[in-house]
């Protein structure tokens, strides 16, 4: 395969003599233009940026004056011109390039300050199709890419947050920039255009209902670098995609240390789980360890919901993540701070609760600003060696399913409510998952076992331990409903559940041996319903 090859010298210091400024986000642009003007830099600009700089009383030249071609088509065409791109792309030390510049009257551009139409913001706000298309920038990305390619000679700035460092460079080096800085800004520029194009590509896929586009690019903006990843020897960073889904990505850290990689992963799992329970129906609390719930409950008040969730497995809850579906109040905060907790996340926090939590300065307190809607569609992704698995979010809700009673005995109304509660929780438990629940409270949770029978046994064991800790005479699973997130392949799993005291079972169904399981349920007077929906989680 033939490739383009050209060795380009890279001078360390390049003096800024001419700058092109064309931005949508005008944060700091006038101040930057002022700093450049004071150094005698010639300013070129376009449209609204030109007006902002000129209004500030600074000398600035409209790009159309150097191209000899006016802005046309509502500004769609203004910088797509050889005079502009030649000035950005010319190799200053190449005699042929210099001759071409001289012949065509092209002036070299040493600095490009460019940011883009707010496509991502318009998309996130739900703009209609024509408006969203109109906010696809064309000239901006072209200038950014041209400048970044020629970073040996051209400095490209795409982020107002970099203006201060750039001005420091000018002050330190007599109006010049260092190659290392230009190189770093070029890398950042290409990352920006890549993310921008990814957002456009993904929007088209959504708008046209293309489930598996030929190219799938998942972009994100760096929110924070982390001390390490899952383990201290792993490097990590947190990127946000821009999806306006309330949760750990959008939450405000009200107090406490920076969230760790594991904190973020666990907090996301906790908040997505607790959002399954509508706050207008009842307060709810979920306690998470290692992305699995160790206790979930509703209650007549938020503090009662927390106490009931904690009662399921108070040992595992130590050092856990607590998620609430209602505003954290003072009474609940007083209870929570009695136990070592890593993170609390809630839709909001009262001032009284903040004053209580502050007594635990290392406790991370997050205000999410709302609850995520479990029914809203979205994507999830997971890396594998050399690949990326992408799927739609599991937004199936048990309330939306037509439950099928498959046993002789139908569940009572209370059993049915407990079944739905357990199935909601089971959706968020690592497979194989078995969840016992009674009266809006998990009684025992078995997670992540290779055998469903083992998950059922572990859940029952957890319930026995909880009963002992609470001084109860019988396990919490006695008279409970139990959920399996996937079908029961054999009757042995059901028999383990019955032995634990469950009287009602909810599962997807679909096994070759469904009838065998149904017969066993009928033999023991158990009520069982099929949901027709599986909730594997890995």
From Swiss-Prot:
Transmembrane segments: none annotated. Keywords: Hydrolase, Multifunctional enzyme, Purine biosynthesis, Transferase. SMART domains: AICARFT_IMPCHas, MGS. It catalyses: (6R)-10-formyltetrahydrofolate + 5-amino-1-(5-phospho-beta-D-ribosyl)imidazole-4-carboxamide = 5-formamido-1-(5-phospho-D-ribosyl)imidazole-4-carboxamide + (6S)-5,6,7,8-tetrahydrofolate; IMP + H2O = 5-formamido-1-(5-phospho-D-ribosyl)imidazole-4-carboxamide. GO terms for cellular component: cytosol. Pfam families: AICARFT_IMPCHas (PF01808), MGS (PF02142). The keyword Hydrolase applies. Pathway: Purine metabolism; IMP biosynthesis via de novo pathway; 5-formamido-1-(5-phospho-D-ribosyl)imidazole-4-carboxamide from 5-amino-1-(5-phospho-D-ribosyl)imidazole-4-carboxamide (10-formyl THF route): step 1/1; Purine metabolism; IMP biosynthesis via de novo pathway; IMP from 5-formamido-1-(5-phospho-D-ribosyl)imidazole-4-carboxamide: step 1/1. Coiled coil: none annotated. CDD domains: IMPCH. Its EC number is 2.1.2.3, 3.5.4.10. GO terms for molecular function: IMP cyclohydrolase activity; phosphoribosylaminoimidazolecarboxamide formyltransferase activity. GO terms for biological process: 'de novo' IMP biosynthetic process. Gene3D superfamilies: 3.40.140.20, Methylglyoxal synthase-like domain (3.40.50.1380). Residues 8-158 form the MGS-like domain. The IMP cyclohydrolase activity resides in the N-terminal region. Belongs to the PurH family. This is Bifunctional purine biosynthesis protein PurH. The gene is purH.
């Amino acid at each position: 395969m033939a490739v383009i090859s050209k060795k380009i010298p890279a001078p360390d210091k390049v003096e800024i003599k001419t700058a092109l400024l064309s931005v949508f986000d005008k944060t700091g642009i006038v101040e930057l233009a002022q700093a450049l003007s004071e150094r005698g830099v010639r300013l070129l600009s376009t449209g609204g940026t030109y007006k902002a700089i000129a209004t500030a009383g600074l000398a600035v030249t409209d790009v159309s004056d150097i191209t000899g071609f006016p802005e046309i088509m509502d500004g769609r065409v203004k910088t797509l011109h050889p005079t502009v791109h030649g000035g950005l792309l010319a190799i200053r030390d190449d005699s042929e390039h210099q001759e071409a510049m001289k012949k065509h009257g092209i002036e070299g551009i040493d600095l490009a300050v460019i940011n883009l139409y707010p496509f991502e913001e318009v998309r996130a706000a739900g703009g209609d199709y024509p408006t969203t298309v109109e906010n696809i920038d064309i000239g901006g990305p072209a200038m950014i890419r041209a400048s970044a390619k020629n970073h040996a000679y051209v400095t490209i700035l795409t982020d107002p947050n970099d203006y201060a460092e750039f001005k420091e460079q000018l002050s330190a080096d007599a109006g010049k920039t260092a190659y290392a800085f230009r190189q770093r800004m070029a890398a950042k520029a290409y990352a920006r255009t890549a993310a921008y194009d990814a957002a456009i590509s993904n929007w088209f896929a959504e708008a046209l209902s293309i489930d598996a586009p030929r190219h799938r690019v998942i972009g994100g903006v760096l929110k924070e670098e982390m001390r390490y990843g899952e383990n201290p020897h792993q490097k990590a960073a947190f990127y946000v995609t821009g999806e306006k889904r309330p949760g750990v990505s959008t939450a405000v850290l009200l107090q406490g240390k920076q969230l760790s990689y594991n904190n973020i992963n666990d907090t996301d799992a906790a908040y997505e789980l607790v959002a399954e329970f509508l706050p207008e129906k009842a307060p709810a609390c979920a306690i998470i360890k290692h992305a699995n719930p160790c206790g979930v409950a509703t209650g007549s008040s938020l503090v009662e919901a927390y106490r009931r969730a904690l009662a399921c497995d108070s040992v595992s809850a130590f050092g856990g993540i607590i998620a609430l579906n209602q505003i954290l109040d003072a009474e609940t905060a007083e209870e929570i701070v009695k136990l070592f907790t890593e993170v609390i996340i809630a839709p909001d926090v009262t001032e009284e609760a903040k004053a209580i939590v502050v007594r635990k300065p290392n406790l991370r307190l997050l205000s999410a600003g709302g609850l995520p809607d479990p029914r809203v569609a979205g994507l999830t992704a997971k890396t594998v060696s050399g690949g990326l698995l992408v799927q739609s979010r599991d937004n199936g809700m048990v309330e939306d399913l037509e439950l099928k009673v498959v046993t002789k005995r139908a569940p009572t109304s209370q059993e049915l409510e407990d079944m739905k509660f357990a199935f909601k929780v089971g959706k968020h438990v690592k497979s194989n998952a078995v969840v016992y629940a009674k009266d809006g409270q998990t009684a025992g949770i078995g997670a992540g076992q290779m055998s469903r029978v083992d998950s059922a046994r572990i859940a029952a064991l957890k319930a026995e331990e909880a009963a002992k800790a609470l001084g109860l005479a019988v396990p919490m699973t006695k008279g409970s409903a139990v959920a399996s997130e996937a079908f029961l392949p054999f009757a042995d799993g059901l028999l383990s559940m019955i032995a634990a005291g469950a009287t009602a079972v909810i599962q997807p169904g679909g096994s070759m041996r469904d009838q065998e399981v149904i017969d066993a349920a009928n033999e023991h007077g158990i009520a069982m319903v099929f949901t027709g929906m599986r909730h594997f989680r890995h």
